[in-house]
């Protein structure tokens, strides 16, 4: 039981690149495909109209496409995340979340910087 708890804590503590690498290992070596949309999600009670009207306060900055000028995008990703060169390059090539839980203003600023470098970015 303690070993499983330790394993769960290690998985939760993975960085985005480590999680991407884990996904690739599970897929390539064990044939385990990630479920689209998250297989663990459970439907909760229906949200009332008041909940639907709430404005989102935290955003994920998602890199959709690095574009033609990957070097500038890698530089911006390094500046935003503090990752090393190889990790930033891997993230840019694989795509995915650059930053999680950013405020709206910070997320918009990151999006502008990445788009100025030539990347296609979404806020989720």
Swiss-Prot record:
Family annotation (InterPro entries): Ribosomal_bL12, Ribosomal_bL12_C, Ribosomal_bL12_C/ClpS-like, Ribosomal_bL12_oligo, Ribosomal_bL12_oligo_N_sf
MF terms from GO for this chain are: mRNA binding; structural constituent of ribosome
Q: Name one GO cellular component term.
A: cytosolic large ribosomal subunit
The entry's keywords? Ribonucleoprotein, Ribosomal protein
Q: Which residues form a coiled coil?
A: none
Q: List the disulfide bonds.
A: none
Q: Which domain of life is it from?
A: Bacteria
Pfam families assigned to the protein according to its UniProt record, in alphabetical order = Ribosomal_L12, Ribosomal_L12_N
- Keyword Ribosomal protein present in the record's keywords: the answer is yes
Record flagged with keyword Ribosomal protein? yes
One GO biological process term is: translation
Name the protein family: Belongs to the bacterial ribosomal protein bL12 family.
Instruction: Explain the purpose of this protein.
Output: Forms part of the ribosomal stalk which helps the ribosome interact with GTP-bound translation factors. Is thus essential for accurate translation.
Q: How does the record describe its quaternary structure?
A: Homodimer. Part of the ribosomal stalk of the 50S ribosomal subunit. Forms a multimeric L10(L12)X complex, where L10 forms an elongated spine to which 2 to 4 L12 dimers bind in a sequential fashion. Binds GTP-bound translation factors.
Matching HAMAP family:
Ribosomal_bL12
Which NCBIfam families does this one have?
L12
User: What is the designated name of this protein?
Assistant: Large ribosomal subunit protein bL12
What organism does this protein naturally occur in?
Paracoccus denitrificans (strain Pd 1222)
Instruction: Give the encoding gene's name.
Output: rplL
